[in-house]
UniProtKB/Swiss-Prot annotation:
The chain crosses the membrane at residues 4-24, 42-62, 100-120, 145-165, 171-191. Keywords: Cell membrane, Membrane, Transmembrane, Transmembrane helix. This is Uncharacterized protein aq_836. The keyword DNA repair does not apply. The keyword NADP does not apply.
C-alpha cells in the first residue's frame, strides 16, 4: 500500500502525469500543492517503501531524464519547482532505504523557495521571470534567503544525494554519466531562471514589501535544517 502511494507522492512515470494534471488544473490549490506534495513524499520516505524492483528503477531513471529535459521548457517558477522536484525525487527510488534523507535534502530548500514565491504572489506578482527581475536588490531579506535556498537545492542537495546513491551507480558506466549530465542541466537551468532575480534590475523599483520576522524565522530555520542534513 505504501509503495502504491509512493509512486504518486514520490512521482514516477506514468503516475507523475496525474500529479502534472492536478497541478495544471487545480488553480484553487496551486498555492499549497507543492509543499503538500513534498510533505507526503517525506512521509512516504519515513514509512519506508521496501525494495524497488528492476521495472521501478527503470521507470525512476526514465522519469528523471524526461523531467530534466522538460526543464528546458518551463515557463515560470512554479513549473520549475515541480518539474525539478520530480526530476530529482524520482531518483530516490534507486535507493529506497535512504529515500527520507534523499527527498528531505531537496524538499527543504525547494519549499523555502516556494514560500518566497508565495510571498510575492500574495502581493500581486505573477511567478514569472519578468516579474521577479531585480527583486533581490529591492528586497534584500527575500533575496538572501532565495540565494541560499537556490544554492542548497542546486549544489548541496544534489551532492548529498549523489553521495547517498554512490553505492548504486559506482562503476555503472551508463548511470554515472546520466546523473552527471542531469546535474549540469539542473545547474544551468536553475541559475538561468533565477539569475535575473539577483543580477538584473527593473527600470523602476517594484512596489513589493520584504519579508517580516514572522516569515523570516521559520524559513531560516528550514534552511538551517537543510544545510545541517548532510552532516547528520
Amino acid at each position: 500500500m505504501i509503495k502504491l502511494l509512493g509512486v504518486f507522492f514520490v512521482p514516477i512515470i506514468p503516475f507523475s502525469f496525474v500529479v502534472d494534471y492536478v497541478f495544471e488544473n487545480c488553480k484553487s490549490c496551486r498555492n499549497y500543492f507543492f509543499p503538500v506534495l513534498v510533505l507526503l513524499g517525506v512521509l512516504v520516505g519515513a514509512l519506508g517503501v521496501g525494495k524497488a524492483g528492476t521495472l521501478l528503477i527503470l521507470l525512476a531513471v526514465l522519469t528523471s531524464i524526461a523531467y530534466t529535459y522538460r526543464l528546458f521548457r518551463v515557463q515560470n517558477y512554479e513549473e520549475w519547482l515541480l518539474t525539478y522536484y520530480i526530476a530529482v525525487a524520482s531518483l530516490s527510488w534507486l535507493h529506497p532505504e535512504k529515500m527520507l534523507f534523499f527527498i528531505s535534502a531537496f524538499a527543504i530548500p525547494l519549499t523555502v523557495i516556494h514560500f518566497l514565491i508565495l510571498h510575492m504572489k500574495n502581493q500581486g506578482a505573477k511567478p514569472e521571470v519578468e516579474e521577479f527581475k531585480g527583486i533581490a536588490t529591492y528586497l534584500p531579506v527575500l533575496g538572501t534567503l532565495a540565494f541560499v535556498a537556490l544554492v542548497s537545492s542546486l549544489v548541496i542537495a544534489p551532492a548529498y544525494a549523489f553521495f547517498t546513491l554512490y553505492g548504486v551507480f559506482k562503476g555503472n558506466l551508463i548511470l554515472t554519466p546520466i546523473l552527471l549530465i542531469e546535474w549540469l542541466v539542473w545547474l544551468w537551468v536553475g541559475f538561468k531562471m533565477f539569475s535575473p532575480v539577483f543580477f538584473e534590475e527593473k527600470a523602476e523599483a517594484p512596489k513589493y514589501e520584504d519579508l517580516d520576522f514572522s516569515e523570516v524565522f521559520p524559513l531560516t530555520f528550514l534552511l538551517f535544517l537543510g544545510l545541517l542534513l548532510p552532516v547528520l
